[in-house]
A protein has these predicted regions:
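Conserved PLP-enzyme active-site core in the AAT-like
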Residues: 9-18, 81-312, 320
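N-terminal "arm"/small-domain region of PLP-dependent enzymes with the aminotransferase-like
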Residues: 2-61, 69
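PLP-dependent enzyme catalytic core of the Aspartate aminotransferase-like
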Residues: 1, 119-120, 128-129, 147-150, ...
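Conserved small-domain helix->loop->beta segment predominantly found in fold-type I
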Residues: 273-276, 280-282, 287, 291, ...
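Short hydrophobic/aromatic beta-strand micro-patches
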Residues: 223, 347-349, 409-411
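Conserved N-terminal alpha-helix of the aminotransferase class I/II PLP-enzyme fold
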Residues: 39-91, 113-121
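Short loop segments at secondary-structure junctions
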Residues: 34, 225-228, 350-353
């Protein structure tokens, strides 16, 4: 069933899987590693990428593909690939078009794990990264580019600094330098922001967060808009535009057109590196996606109330939440986010600094101290001690993380109960 004219709420329920007569209404779990064919030639056609189908779940599985298609539809992309984690998604998204000797430019205010991936791990593979201030001018961002730059990377809403990305600015710089803009859209989700509509080329997600919503599965997604012209810059992206010796000389852009990028990531990287999620995890993810619009709306409503409460409290020195009119990124949120809604995550600092933050967190009763974020239950974390612990002081400043910053992931409980829990904990801070 074609879903292009339906609203996102409807796509969350119906896109990706349309049952035929007598088939299950719920997405089936294809719990199988392998798939049967009648002849050796049929199987051979699959291995040569000359036919569509399934032969081994490490590359593709019907359950996984249905969910990937749903997320691609939500983002307005042409194709998608699910991975075993958000980190795997970001790694694949970059490594699919980068190799030893290449260079990446990335916003500095990104999740600590991604910062380490780009700044440390990829360096071991011969891929260098230059970090730029997300608020830098287009000229300052452009100055970080080198002749061997292949990618510009950023997050729509930075974790945990909550910087709102000026997507059009970043897209313009990327395209002027003939590279794609890859945007991690985890916090915003396609319910609140669709980066392709503002010039981004590839979107990634940690589906572990709002898309799942219940902290029961770990996963990631890569979605391609199909808009970046790889052939126009074939001298840079020869992995897509020149013959792949591992598939008897197939040229991805020639054979797969707008789906070349995702096809290469699936048939080459997933084949060699794995990182495929289990069909059961994808089934759970699909259940989360079905209620995503309802949950995102409630998360944002609750977060707005909590942010206003914190902003007015005498023990809170400052609150970072773009839903507040006095927030630095309020105008960008109004521009890029549906109805100005961003996410359910708030960052704030207490007047007593780091010690007060510890006392506050240890006094919470309803909210859980947990590494996770963007789940249905309220959770709290101290980034400098947890997610960004591997950074030095200078790197923390560049990432927008102060020593006393608290990251609060507001759940979908009663807003009154959440605020009362915070109020009691603040008395002990």
């Amino acid at each position: 069933m074609m879903m292009s004219h339906y609203d996102l709420e409807t796509k969350c329920l119906h896109s990706g899987y349309t049952p035929k007569k007598g088939e299950p209404c719920a997405l089936p779990i294809y719990q199988s590693t392998t798939f049967k064919y009648d002849t050796t030639d049929e199987m051979g056609q699959l291995f040569d990428l000359k036919a569509e189908g399934y032969f081994y779940t490490r590359l593709q599985n019907p359950t996984n593909d249905a969910v990937a298609a749903k997320i691609a539809d939500l983002e307005g992309g042409v194709a998608g690939l699910l991975t075993s984690s958000g980190q795997a998604a970001n790694f694949y998204a970059i490594f699919n078009i980068c190799e030893a000797g290449d260079h990446v430019v990335a916003a500095s205010t990104i999740y600590g794990g991604t910062f380490n991936l780009l700044g440390v791990t990829l360096k071991k593979l011969g891929i260098d990264c230059t970090f730029v201030d997300t608020d830098a001018s287009a000229e300052e961002i452009a100055a970080a580019f080198k002749p061997n730059t292949k990618v510009l990377f950023a997050e729509t809403i930075a974790n945990p600094a909550l910087v709102i990305l000026d997507i059009e600015k970043f897209a313009k710089v990327a395209h002027e330098h003939e590279v794609p803009l890859i945007v991690d859209n985890t916090f915003a989700t396609p319910i609140n922001c669709r980066p392709f509509e503002w010039g981004a080329d590839i979107v990634t997600h940690s589906t572990t967060k709002y898309m799942d919503g219940h902290a029961v599965q770990v996963g990631g997604a890569i979605i391609d808009s199909g808009n970046f012209d790889w052939d126009a810059y074939g001298h840079k992206y020869h992995g897509l535009t020149e013959p792949d010796e591992s598939y008897h000389g197939v040229v991805y852009t020639k054979q797969f057109g707008k789906k070349a990028y995702i096809t290469k990531a699936t048939t080459q990287l997933m084949r060699d590196l794995g990182s495929i999620p289990s069909p059961e995890n994808c089934f759970l993810l699909n259940l989360g996606l079905e209620t995503l619009p309802l949950r995102v709306e409630r998360h944002c409503e609750n977060a707005q109330k909590v942010a206003e409460f914190l902003d007015a409290h005498e023990k809170v020195s400052h609150v970072i939440y773009a839903g507040l009119p006095n927030d630095k990124y309020h105008e960008l949120a109004q521009k890029y986010m549906d109805k100005g809604r961003t996410c359910g995550v708030i960052s704030f600092e207490l007047t007593g600094g780091r010690d007060a933050a510890v006392r506050f967190m240890d006094s919470l009763k309803l909210a859980n101290i947990a590494t996770h974020v963007a789940a249905s239950k309220t959770m709290v974390l101290h980034p400098a001690s947890h997610t960004h612990r591997q950074m030095n002081d200078e790197q923390l400043r560049e990432a927008g993380v102060s020593p006393g910053m608290i990251r609060l992931s507001v759940g979908i409980e009663s807003a009154k109960d959440i605020i009362n829990d915070l109020k009691e904990a603040l008395e002990n801070a």
